[in-house]
Amino acid sequence: MQKLIVVILAAGQGTRMKSSMPKVLHTVGDRSMLEHSYDRAKDLGADAIHIVYGHGGEQVKSALSHLDANWVLQQQQNGTGHAVEAAMPSIEDDALVLVLYGDVPLVRVDTLKSLVSAAVESGFGLLTAKLDDPTGYGRIIRDGDGVVKRIVEQKDGSAEELKTDEVNTGMLVVDSSKLRDWINALDSDNAQGEFYLTDIIAMAANDGVVINTVQPTSIDETLGANNRVQLAELERYLQQRKANQLMIDGVTLRDPARIDIRGQLTTGMDVVIDINCLFEGDVKLGSNINIGANCIIRDSILADGVTVMPNSIIEESQVGNGAMVGPFARLRPETVLKEDAKIGNFVEVKKSTIGAGSKVSHLSYIGDTSMGKNVNIGAGTITCNYDGTNKHQTIIGDDVFVGSDSQLIAPVTLESGATIGAGTTLSNTAPQDSLTISRSRQKSVPGWSRPKKRS
């Protein structure tokens, strides 16, 4: 069986992006466009991946140094044929070569599998598409029997040829030995003065090679981005694709056009997601979860039965069965909510464990805290965990009641069953099953009158 070698062309300057960053590093979803193309090559099980870079190449290599690929420098950008030629010394004979593009990120792996199969059958597979408006694309020219004969570029085509609505996507699979011969025979006698990879189509046809064509499931698979408008269009296509898959998997989206997934979102059954929610990184949702509008959830796990009220943020946290978050709550990294815990409006929790059934309902900050079960934290309570140099722990046992407007000066312990009176500033241990209170005794002054303004 022939090896599969993937060449990703990523040397374009991308001047229309008007950016100091190379075009292929601009992101769609959570990943650069080049990484999307690389991912598809890995999904195919490619035996080797060569990335041809040019403009801003060192910046590209530095940003994506984690990729398992051979980086090939194209010294001068003299067209797609010249770019593939730069990679040929690294490609062995008797292999299949798949050409992808670093700025065409949405091609599906199933489409590429079909393209590879087409090449296995005849030695040449070509991905084409039919467009309502093919302006700007190279046209597929067939003979009277429907056999592909050549590709003509927009600037080189006759008026009759440009009427053709079938276009070249640039993606192809070809035998490496034949590709080497055809690449060596390319010339730059065209309107652009460049070496077109598409010219090998006519060479293959003249050599009697049957060019099998494959068409994608949807046109967004073939689209690239040369400017920010097109980049935004790709983002919408990707998000719509992800939203559709969620709904197929049983998720209710109140508006599929108003959800963004920048990473991996996995869900159980009967999940409901309201509008304008953003999921980043690796997010796992259990079953019977309700997420309100305008929430951001990143790298977190939500167990079954969780409710997230509108305008809440959850970052690198774990939320247990039946817990409730929000509205307007924030869970910062390393927060764990046990089952049936509640974090209410305008509460921030950081690097803390909130025990089963415990409640922090209003206007509080809980940081670096270990909290037991069935604890009630009153409104306006603050764990004072930072002394200006170090963070300190607050330990709260089970069945503790903390009155409103209390300050817990860490390091400090509240033993199980302790009650803290409202307005307390606690700096020492609160004993078990006791009331602890530290505030000035109330005093009333009979007959007192307010000062009067001087005339």
Map each language-model feature to its residues:
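Conserved catalytic-core motifs of eukaryotic protein kinase domains, centered on the activation segment
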Residues: 17-21, 386-387
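Structural signal for interior beta-strand "rungs" in well-ordered beta-sheet cores
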Residues: 252-437, 442-443
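Conserved core of the sugar-phosphate nucleotidyltransferase
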Residues: 58, 67, 107-191, 209
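Short catalytic helix/loop segments, enriched in acidic residues and glycine
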Residues: 20-36
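Short beta-strand/turn micro-motifs composed of small residues
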Residues: 10, 53, 101, 128-129
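Conserved N-terminal catalytic core of the sugar/cofactor nucleotidyltransferase
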Residues: 1-5, 31-117
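N-terminal nucleotide-binding beta1-loop-alpha1 segment
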Residues: 1-19
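Conserved alpha/beta core of the MobA/IspD/sugar-nucleotide pyrophosphorylase nucleotidyltransferase superfamily
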Residues: 167-268
